[in-house]
């Protein structure tokens, strides 16, 4: 009898433990503090980029709670594998050329990939595993380089395989996917001619093909200037002049119409904090010694917001706005959804643009195996929709997506497929189709545009 009672107590304890674990797991999916739960019709569907080896900046205190946006459209009827989203899905996909894109939706794009068929060898797909900066920690993790096509520097496997960014068919397919997602501006990761990141090769000569292909799909191209060796206010002045002189007359070159009615090129400056505000002010303030203001090379310059103190640095430097880039909520002050309302208030008070960056998830352990604490699971699209809702809550002029195809950090919305090789089992978008994140993006893009119309009334 005592034995039976003991077994019953153990069983009851296990049931309670399971229930507690499930409850705590569900708590991780709730909207961050300071954000409303998704409104009617916006229920979640069931469906870091930083210098390599650098430590993660600490997140700061949460901002004041944000006011919810106007009520969204009514929910769609869920099918057995789905649940409501911002708008009903099309019964039949529309022809790509007839699909509308929105210039207020930007996506970060990488053209650094190469394959033996085009370049004679793999580029970036064979990314090295970056060692941790602490040798003691680094010793516990694998080192070396990935070996495509079975072993990629990515936790997901692209539907196109380990492709070359120079392949015209790949470019056309990418533009098709961008258009399916309603993305109107491709933000191209850019290095000056003859320069590249540590794992890549120069690719400025590919820009004309990207512009030409984008133009065929009514997509525009903006530039995301990367932190190459020796970058400062003087070299960026030369970069801006080169980009505008070389590409500024192309029909796909993106220009943003500001509040004064002037159409100016828009540039994102990655890791802008590496240069002092005083140096940037030489370039970006009207009285700077080599100012581009009120010259043919004037533009809209968007700085990267990482730490809270960067807001004042960005203002003093003469930038026109700030973006957050990182797709890992909580990784930095800027990437934390709960801080976006405070950032938007600061920007509004100082005539700056705030461009929040949203992503479908984050996992870079294929190239930084020690960085699993920054992984953000996709939860079949829920993480992405939570980020999109957080962005719309602050009523931004533009929303940026991290990313279309940064495969190393697992932030891509590009189509991925299930894949198992002798050495790897890749993540995928199951139980949904490879186009899941393109479909979610279009649905939210259309909702974003409708919301903006209400904001302006």
UniProtKB/Swiss-Prot annotation:
Any ranges marked Lumenal in the topology annotation, and which? 30-457
> What EC number is given for this enzyme?
3.2.1.-
InterPro entries named in the record = Glyco_Hydrolase_99
Pro residues: compositionally biased ranges: 65-87
Assign the protein's first listed, main location to one coarse class. Golgi
Q: Which residues cross the membrane?
A: 9-29
Keywords per UniProt: Golgi apparatus, Hydrolase, Membrane, Signal-anchor, Transmembrane, Transmembrane helix
GO cellular component terms given for this protein: Golgi membrane
Q: What is this protein called?
A: Glycoprotein endo-alpha-1,2-mannosidase-like protein
Q: Which organism is it from?
A: Homo sapiens (Human)
């Amino acid at each position: 009898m005592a034995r039976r009672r003991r077994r019953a107590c153990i069983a009851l304890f296990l049931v309670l433990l399971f229930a507690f674990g499930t409850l705590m797991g569900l708590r991780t999916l709730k909207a961050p503090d300071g954000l409303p739960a998704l409104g009617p019709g916006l229920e979640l569907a069931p469906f870091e980029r930083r210098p390599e080896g650098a430590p993660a900046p600490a997140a700061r205190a949460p901002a004041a709670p944000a006011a919810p946006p106007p009520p969204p459209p009514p929910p769609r009827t869920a099918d057995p594998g789905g649940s409501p989203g911002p708008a009903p899905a099309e019964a039949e996909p529309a022809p790509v050329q007839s699909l509308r894109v929105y210039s207020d939706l930007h996506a970060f794009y990488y053209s650094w990939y190469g394959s033996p068929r085009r370049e004679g060898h793999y580029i970036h797909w064979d990314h090295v595993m970056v060692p941790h900066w602490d040798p003691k920690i680094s010793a516990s993790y694998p080192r070396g380089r990935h070996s495509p096509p079975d072993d990629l520097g990515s936790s997901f496997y692209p539907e196109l395989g380990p492709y070359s960014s120079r392949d015209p068919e790949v470019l056309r397919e990418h533009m098709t996917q961008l258009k399916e997602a309603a993305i109107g501006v491709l933000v191209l990761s850019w290095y000056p001619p003859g320069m590249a990141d540590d794992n890549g090769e120069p690719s400025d000569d590919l820009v004309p093909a990207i512009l030409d292909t984008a133009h065929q799909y009514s997509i525009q191209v903006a530039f995301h200037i990367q932190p190459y060796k020796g970058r400062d206010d003087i070299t960026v002045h030369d970069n801006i002049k080169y980009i505008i002189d070389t590409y500024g007359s192309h029909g796909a070159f993106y220009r943003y119409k500001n509040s004064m009615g002037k159409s100016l090129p828009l540039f994102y400056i990655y890791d802008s904090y590496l240069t002092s505000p005083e140096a940037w002010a030489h370039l970006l303030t009207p009285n700077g010694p080599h100012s581009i203001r009120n010259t043919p090379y004037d533009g809209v310059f968007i700085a990267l917001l990482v730490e809270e103190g960067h807001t004042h640095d960005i203002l003093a430097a003469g930038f026109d706005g700030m973006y957050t880039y990182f797709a890992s909520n909580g990784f930095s002050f800027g990437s934390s959804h709960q801080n976006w309302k405070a950032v938007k208030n600061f920007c509004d008070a100082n005539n700056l643009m705030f461009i929040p960056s949203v992503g479908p998830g984050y996992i870079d352990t294929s190239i930084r195996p020690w960085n699993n604490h920054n992984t953000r699971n996709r939860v079949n699209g829920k993480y992405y929709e939570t980020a999109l809702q957080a962005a719309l809550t602050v009523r931004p002029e533009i929303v940026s997506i991290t990313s279309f195809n940064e495969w190393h950090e697992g932030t891509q919305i590009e189509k991925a497929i299930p894949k198992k090789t002798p050495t790897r089992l890749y993540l995928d978008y199951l139980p949904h189709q490879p186009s899941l994140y393109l479909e979610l993006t279009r649905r939210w893009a259309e909702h974003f545009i409708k919301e903006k119309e209400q904001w302006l009334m």
